[in-house]
Regions:
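Flavin-dependent oxidoreductase catalytic cores
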Residues: 5-207
């Protein structure tokens, strides 16, 4: 079921009830002009099929754009194929994902809404589907519920991951996306783990 925002209506200038006079004004973010300041944060739907954009995903984000949101940040989008965060999440780790993203971006753009892809590497938070190799992390520390400890990611692997993030961002651009957000929050996934003293016990330049 699509969810719109029927309450997104501009109030008259000087209206004493309007406590946020700039909410519906455009805002400049880098090279992008967003039509208003109502942003949709990343919210997982798990509507992808084998990491590919589906019609359900297009309808989901299209409904929010149609409702008046100025900018949408997508749910997590993985940058490499080895580790899957959750079944039903999206990826853009090779060019085969670009056509689906082109359709998604076109759907959102027809309503004047911008869309960013939230790029992510799940690392020690990856879903342990059969065949998944040992999970990686900044160091040997994993979440409390893990059945086995992850292995520390190597410096060589980190160089590859940097390239994979860059290549994923380029694919988003090719598909018509307006930018990317890098998920590095609350010790969640690889980059968030590097920023947390609970998970990052390294003694090298990455510690």
């Amino acid at each position: 079921m699509g969810f719109c925002f029927p309450y997104i209506k501009r109030k008259k200038a000087g209206d004493p009830m309007n406590k946020y006079p700039h909410l519906f004004e455009p805002i400049q973010i880098g090279t992008q002009t967003v039509k208003n300041r109502v942003f949709m944060p990343p919210i997982s739907t798990n509507l992808a099929n084998k990491c590919y954009v589906t019609e359900e995903l297009i309808q989901h984000y299209g409904a929010r754009a149609r409702g008046g949101v100025g900018l949408i940040v997508s749910e997590v989008v993985t940058v490499e194929p080895t580790y899957i965060y959750l079944p039903g999440d999206m990826s853009i780790h090779d060019d085969s994902f670009i056509p689906g993203w082109e359709k998604l971006c076109a759907e959102v753009h027809q309503y004047g809404t911008k869309i960013l892809a939230q790029l992510f590497h799940p690392a020690y938070m990856a879903f342990p589907i059969p065949g998944t190799p040992q999970l990686i992390a900044p160091s040997h520390v994993g979440p409390y519920y893990a059945k086995s400890a992850p292995r520390p990611v190597t410096k060589e692997e980190l160089k590859v991951l940097v390239r994979q993030f860059g290549e994923a961002a380029k694919r988003v651009q090719k598909a018509g996306g307006d930018g990317v957000e890098i998920h590095a929050a609350h010790a969640h996934g690889l980059l968030g783990g590097f920023l947390s003293p609970l998970y990052n016990k390294r003694c090298d330049e990455y510690g």
